[in-house]
A protein has these predicted regions:
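Glycoside hydrolase catalytic-domain context in secreted enzymes
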Residues: 1-171
């Protein structure tokens, strides 16, 4: 495994992407994981945004906290605040360099820095084609895994009601 995505939810009271226990102690120390940790899209914003986790006061603190907890790459735009976080003394460049080293190592291992790579010649019209989108949808549908079916709750019965709650319930 070269890349792991941390989730939106909390673990032991902390956002998963900012959990030192989850990402550093368990994932990296106990399980000896050496790869990249990337946030789910918008997960770092949830640290400080009103109505979400609200565990950090601002972008700088959230970004520094995520990197210090082992989230190397963010799907979002909070990490743009890392220079301000460095200026405020929330994190130093050496700590950011650890993530940068992991990210660049992965890119070199993938051959992204090689002079000629096969995917350079594939046009966007092919990558973003209907056939590729249809295949991605089929794969997603086939890859959903039910880990437990307690009390045979699935499949849902037509007369059954469920509640969707939380900050992403309307998404």
């Amino acid at each position: 495994v070269k890349e792991v995505m941390c989730a939106y939810n909390r673990f032991e009271g902390e956002p998963c992407c900012g959990s030192n226990r989850l990402l550093m102690q368990i994932l990296r120390d106990e399980w000896k994981y050496k790869g990249i940790v990337v946030s789910d899209c918008g997960a770092i914003s949830d640290f400080w945004r009103k109505g979400d986790h609200e565990t950090h006061p601002d972008k700088e603190t959230a970004s520094a906290g995520a990197v210090l907890s082992g989230t190397d790459l963010e799907c979002g735009n909070n990490y743009k605040s890392l220079p301000e976080a460095v200026q405020k003394g929330l994190i130093d460049e050496k700590q950011i360099d650890i993530s940068v080293k992991r990210l660049l190592t992965a890119r070199f291992e993938l051959g992204e820095m090689d002079e000629h790579v096969c995917w350079d010649s594939i046009p966007y019209s092919v990558v973003d084609s209907k056939a590729h989108k249809d295949l991605a949808l089929e794969i997603a549908r086939k890859s959903i895994v039910l880990l437990q079916n307690r009390n045979n709750i699935l499949p849902l019965k037509e007369d059954m009601k469920i509640a969707l709650i939380g900050p992403n319930a309307n998404d």
